[in-house]
Amino acid sequence: MVDTVIPGDMACLDADLLQLQEMSSFVLNSKPGFTQKLFDQWLSLPEAQRQVGSLLKDAVAGAPINVTGSASGSNSATIPSMFPAGSAPPLSPRSCGSPRTTKQRAPSNLGSTLKVVNEPVKEPIPQFYFQNGRPPPSEIKEQCMFRINHFFYGHMDGLQIQEFKLVTREICKLPSFFSTSLFRKIDLNNTGFVTRDAFIDFWVNGNMLIMDTTTQIFKILKQKDQSFIVKDDFKPLLKELLATHPGLEFLQSTPEFQERYAETVTYRIFYYINRSGNGRITFRELKRGNLIDAMLHADEEEDINKVLRYFSYEHFYVIYCKFWELDTDHDFLIDKENLMRYGNHALTYRIVDRIFSQVARKFTSKVEGKMGYEDFVYFILAEEDKSSVPSLEYWFKCIDLDANGIITRNEMQFFYEEQLHRMECMAQEAVLFEDILCQMIDMIGPENESHITLHDLKGSKLSGNVFNILFNLNKFMAFETRDPFLIRQERENPTLTDWDRFAHREYIRLSMEEDVEDASNGSAEVWDDSSLEAPF
């Protein structure tokens, strides 16, 4: 036998397919054991082996198999007879004289002698799943390796954290204040060094190299076994920012205010980014927000007050001072009566009650009837930036008394009644609720005029005015009189938010008050711009 291996299903004998002139298929089928011996004898012939081997090679190669012919045709000799000449056994006789037993056999093709399955050639499927992402292209990897070798040259023991800052900025293209967080991600054993091989394993082999900036930052900030970012994850980041940013150097002598600044930045980040409000920033929330751009801006801009999103020191100063003004006993907690004094008694009792009922947001102070600093940060951002989505959601929950997802006429009237009463007490011209209701409906343009949904509010640029009408008398009167100062501010700086404009006005006011106080105490020095940057 030749080396050709015939699969089992191809070596099974089908007598009808043999198409032998010497013997009928009836005889072959009636004696399977005898027939199998004949088949084995035929398969042992050299010519049969060559024929079968050729067919198998064609089948494996995917080539068309052409063995057509008939037993009586010229190609019948291509497959040899099972028996030597003159040695064929006699045929079994038919029933005598019965014409019905006589059967003329029609010629048939020899091509189906063996059932050869023409299977397609299997092509290898390229890898499509990579646990750490698709590897970087060789060109990008080579460029990165060249830069890595340059920065680690001469540092056989690795780089220390101060030396690692250049790697963070120049190779990783991340803000420099990420250096400590990135360093700790690689130096898992706290050796104080990051070697070349360890950095390559984390940044290149871990495919951090080709990830987008948002993914890189998310992986660096979050804990290894978590799929989200919590407040504590920002601590090393902000600690390094305070230690290295030129616009925050003046705070290094007052560590207590460094801590307050870091807390305020973190609260602002979670207020705008963590839309679920569960204290856990997901990758999707991080990607949808503007935090990454703000971080890159903070790293490039020496004047931290120009980084209006999250990091402005002036914004922190305003928030902290406003809280300090209300916290008369300075226990870092404020109650309802304290909050009623906010904005020169601008808020109604009814809205303050709703705030302290914690329907908009659960307080973190853990003290009954008291609002902590974090709670106040959420409140002031919601109150002074009513054009933002977090603010609309905050106040919608307060006005929606039955929490059924819509604000009805009765709910709006409930809050406006106190506004109306206050206007009458101040001898102001009162605006009837029916008139103001039509005005609010015109501003919002709800899908159903019988009620207002959160979706309706998010679709209107005037939604903040509706809330001012309902519970902030000072802003309501300013809106009614169309304060020319506010209108001019909006036209001069159309890109600024309501919060940006408020914080700027308040910072100037607070700075001037402090300057006057210093002068009255006889401690005023020659005033310059630097005093605005170092109020503490």
From Swiss-Prot:
Coiled coil: none annotated. One of its GO terms (molecular function) is calcium ion binding. Residues 174-209, 261-296, 387-422 form the EF-hand domain. Keywords: Calcium, Metal-binding, Repeat. The keyword Repeat applies. Residues 69-79, 98-108 have a biased composition (Polar residues). Disruption phenotype: No visible phenotype. Residues 69-108, 517-536 are annotated as: Disordered. It holds the Pfam family EF-hand_13. The keyword Metal-binding applies. InterPro entries: EF-hand-dom_pair, EF-hand_13, EF_Hand_1_Ca_BS, EF_hand_dom. It comes from the Eukaryota. Ca(2+) binds at residues 400, 402, 404, 411. Residues 526-536 have a biased composition (Acidic residues). Regulatory subunit of type 2A protein phosphatase. Involved in post-transcriptional regulation of HMGR but not in root growth regulation in response to salt. PP2A consists of a common heterodimeric core enzyme, composed of a 36 kDa catalytic subunit (subunit C) and a 65 kDa constant regulatory subunit (PR65 or subunit A), that associates with a variety of regulatory subunits. Proteins that associate with the core dimer include three families of regulatory subunits B (the R2/B/PR55/B55, R3/B''/PR72/PR130/PR59 and R5/B'/B56 families) and cell signaling molecules. Interacts with HMGR1L and HMGR1S (via N-terminus), but not with HMG2. Interacts with PP2AA1. This is Serine/threonine protein phosphatase 2A regulatory subunit B''beta.
